[in-house]
Amino acid sequence: MPRFDPHPARRPAIIAGASSGIGAATATELARRGFPVALGARRTDKLAKLVDDIRADGGEAVAFALDVTDADSVKSFVARSIDALGDIEVLVSGAGDMYPGRIHETSTDVFADQLQVHLIGANRLATAVLPQMVASRRGDVIFVGSDVALRQRPHMGAYGAAKAGLVAMVANLRMELEGTGVRASIVHPGPTLTEMGWQLSAEQVGPMLADWATWGQARHNYFLRAGDLARAIAFVAETPRGSHVVTMEVQPEAPLTDAPADRQQLQLPDEGMPQ
């Protein structure tokens, strides 16, 4: 009997939070690499457009409504994905939003909402797909973490607490799934240009970036793009059996030191999005 069952030629993947940002980029990247993909999110109109784009490029894609704060929605999404694509080989758990704010100015309800989306929602997805993966003796469950789970930043306490809980959950999964053929991994993005959290005005974002700089957490003005994380997640999923990418952190590279001075510090345009 082989030590490891090899990856099959067909590896259906489900991507939670696929309507925009890292999730959408990951769906596109995995489909480009030959993974059949099932996309889940609340904004089904955006999912439909993404499915059309993937199919137009020769990929295989389906989409279903998904709200990770609703247990029945998660179960329905996973069941419909399996019906459409077959047994799931890869889960990418990336659904989420972010509400920046100082802890003492953040309501307990908002704090709890962040836990529901980023921690409880991820748990719902994992427990929905893992029985089938364990029975199949293979699979990858890949969670989108955050560098704020590793090094806290001001104004991101609720989000960071939820992601720190996710780190602990994934560590437990990795230990408890050892020997089953299922690999649990977490990919931590650094600052990334996506819709999440950046719909704020300059008046809202300004104090946050200023506090980041005070604590030495905004040394330069380059942000990752969603595609950078998509490639990292695809790398984890495609890692050959017999090895396991447990944790990956991706940070934006600093501009060259001889770049103009205005490219060395975070700049804040009127709409609030860092340049």
Question: Model segments located where?
Answer:
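Conserved glycine-rich cofactor-binding loop
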Residues: 19-20
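Residue(s) in the substrate-gating loop at a strand-loop-helix junction
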Residues: 146
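Substrate-binding pocket helix/loop in short-chain dehydrogenase/reductase
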Residues: 102-103, 107-115
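Active-site helix of classical SDR
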Residues: 126, 162
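Conserved glycine-rich Rossmann-like NAD(P)H-binding loop of the short-chain dehydrogenase/reductase
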Residues: 33-50
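Active-site loop-to-helix junction immediately N-terminal to the catalytic Tyr of the SDR YXXXK motif
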Residues: 106, 152-160, 172
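C-terminal helical subdomain
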Residues: 186, 205-259, 263
